[in-house]
């Protein structure tokens, strides 16, 4: 098969979206109510990693970067994730705190996009979550200098075993280079796939203490 034939096959990959629509009359005033409903349905549908979200940031040269992390908490203050504070994304957020999140629930023909500003969590919040993690995950947080170049996986595995021995007694301490961010809720867009590519899109945009809702063309 030639490269051109393969590209033609990819170009024809598509399907109709038929799982239902989204109507203005059915929307709650608060977008978190709809988000909670959709997230619950994603969990009930047993989607793989229903809390997985893409975090998009930009560096000092306006070069965008994306990666997938797990949502760990959400409320009216924002959406929370945790990371190594020496990571690329943490440095980029420090330089430019404006970020975008995306929840891609393909099986349900849905996606949710959040736009807001990321702020560091308090040490108390981070410590509370850190000590709720499985012990091996706590140790794993100590192992990796995230985004740095390494020559082989064995370096990580050896370091993990070394630290597992070191921390075998008592609590695993919270690394000073590990923390979390809360992304404020300035805009939330809900997308529901529709037949004939007539998808339903609704944008919630915060205006003072209320939410303005607009339908967007697909």
From Swiss-Prot:
<dbReference type="InterPro" id="IPR012349">
    <property type="entry name" value="Split_barrel_FMN-bd"/>
</dbReference>
<keyword id="KW-0285">Flavoprotein</keyword>
<feature type="binding site">
    <location>
        <begin position="67"/>
        <end position="72"/>
    </location>
    <ligand>
        <name>FMN</name>
    </ligand>
</feature>
<feature type="binding site">
    <location>
        <position position="89"/>
    </location>
    <ligand>
        <name>FMN</name>
    </ligand>
</feature>
<dbReference type="GO" id="GO:0010181">
    <property type="term" value="F:FMN binding"/>
</dbReference>
<comment type="function">
    <text>Catalyzes the oxidation of either pyridoxine 5'-phosphate (PNP) or pyridoxamine 5'-phosphate (PMP) into pyridoxal 5'-phosphate (PLP).</text>
</comment>
<dbReference type="GO" id="GO:0008615">
    <property type="term" value="P:pyridoxine biosynthetic process"/>
</dbReference>
<comment type="subunit">
    <text>Homodimer.</text>
</comment>
<comment type="pathway">
    <text>Cofactor metabolism; pyridoxal 5'-phosphate salvage; pyridoxal 5'-phosphate from pyridoxamine 5'-phosphate: step 1/1.</text>
</comment>
<comment type="similarity">
    <text>Belongs to the pyridoxamine 5'-phosphate oxidase family.</text>
</comment>
<dbReference type="InterPro" id="IPR011576">
    <property type="entry name" value="Pyridox_Oxase_N"/>
</dbReference>
<dbReference type="Pfam" id="PF01243">
    <property type="entry name" value="PNPOx_N"/>
</dbReference>
<keyword id="KW-0664">Pyridoxine biosynthesis</keyword>
<feature type="binding site">
    <location>
        <position position="129"/>
    </location>
    <ligand>
        <name>substrate</name>
    </ligand>
</feature>
<feature type="binding site">
    <location>
        <begin position="146"/>
        <end position="147"/>
    </location>
    <ligand>
        <name>FMN</name>
    </ligand>
</feature>
<feature type="binding site">
    <location>
        <begin position="197"/>
        <end position="199"/>
    </location>
    <ligand>
        <name>substrate</name>
    </ligand>
</feature>
<feature type="binding site">
    <location>
        <begin position="82"/>
        <end position="83"/>
    </location>
    <ligand>
        <name>FMN</name>
    </ligand>
</feature>
<protein>
    <recommendedName>
        <fullName>Pyridoxine/pyridoxamine 5'-phosphate oxidase</fullName>
        <ecNumber>1.4.3.5</ecNumber>
    </recommendedName>
</protein>
<feature type="binding site">
    <location>
        <position position="88"/>
    </location>
    <ligand>
        <name>FMN</name>
    </ligand>
</feature>
<feature type="binding site">
    <location>
        <position position="137"/>
    </location>
    <ligand>
        <name>substrate</name>
    </ligand>
</feature>
<feature type="binding site">
    <location>
        <position position="191"/>
    </location>
    <ligand>
        <name>FMN</name>
    </ligand>
</feature>
<feature type="binding site">
    <location>
        <begin position="14"/>
        <end position="17"/>
    </location>
    <ligand>
        <name>substrate</name>
    </ligand>
</feature>
<feature type="binding site">
    <location>
        <position position="201"/>
    </location>
    <ligand>
        <name>FMN</name>
    </ligand>
</feature>
<dbReference type="GO" id="GO:0004733">
    <property type="term" value="F:pyridoxamine phosphate oxidase activity"/>
</dbReference>
<comment type="pathway">
    <text>Cofactor metabolism; pyridoxal 5'-phosphate salvage; pyridoxal 5'-phosphate from pyridoxine 5'-phosphate: step 1/1.</text>
</comment>
<keyword id="KW-0288">FMN</keyword>
<feature type="binding site">
    <location>
        <position position="133"/>
    </location>
    <ligand>
        <name>substrate</name>
    </ligand>
</feature>
<dbReference type="InterPro" id="IPR019740">
    <property type="entry name" value="Pyridox_Oxase_CS"/>
</dbReference>
<dbReference type="InterPro" id="IPR019576">
    <property type="entry name" value="Pyridoxamine_oxidase_dimer_C"/>
</dbReference>
<dbReference type="Pfam" id="PF10590">
    <property type="entry name" value="PNP_phzG_C"/>
</dbReference>
<dbReference type="InterPro" id="IPR000659">
    <property type="entry name" value="Pyridox_Oxase"/>
</dbReference>
<keyword id="KW-0560">Oxidoreductase</keyword>
<feature type="binding site">
    <location>
        <position position="72"/>
    </location>
    <ligand>
        <name>substrate</name>
    </ligand>
</feature>
<feature type="binding site">
    <location>
        <position position="111"/>
    </location>
    <ligand>
        <name>FMN</name>
    </ligand>
</feature>
